[in-house]
Amino acid sequence: METDQKKRPTGMTILLVLSFINACWNIFSSMVMFMATPKLAEMAQNGEVENLMAPFTATMSEEMRESMLAGMNMIAQIDTKYWLFLGILFIGSLMGVIRMFKGDKRGLHIYAISQILILINASFYLYPHQPQSSFVSDLLLTAIFVLLYYLYFKRMEMQNNEPQTPELP
């Protein structure tokens, strides 16, 4: 259902801009990681990750350095298909955001489906390497954005269905 673009609430515009930035950033970073992960995995296997990270970790505490190296080694273990699927799914998310920006409620469906598939993708490839709290926070953030978009579209529909009072000359 098309809605009047002029009546889009400011809060929805802010959410759309944030979602647009998030989708663009994730498309870019997913493609970079898709290309870089094989080399990173090779470096992790050869024990070269610590040398690679040395300039960045030199001023860190031992605990922070170990945590960062563990994170890099974890990233090296993630299948490259995860990054490919993630990039494709964020393209879908971006398409949904663009449609919503134009006032098309179908964009909400595209966005929501893409975000759910992103969570499913991460469940197979990413979350097994991370604490459960990561899944919960991602799920909550996704649910909040989808719910807010839904509520804004409902509000816009109600505003568009209100009887118009004729203007006096």
Each language-model region and where it sits:
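Topology signature of small-to-medium multi-pass alpha-helical membrane proteins
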Residues: 2-169
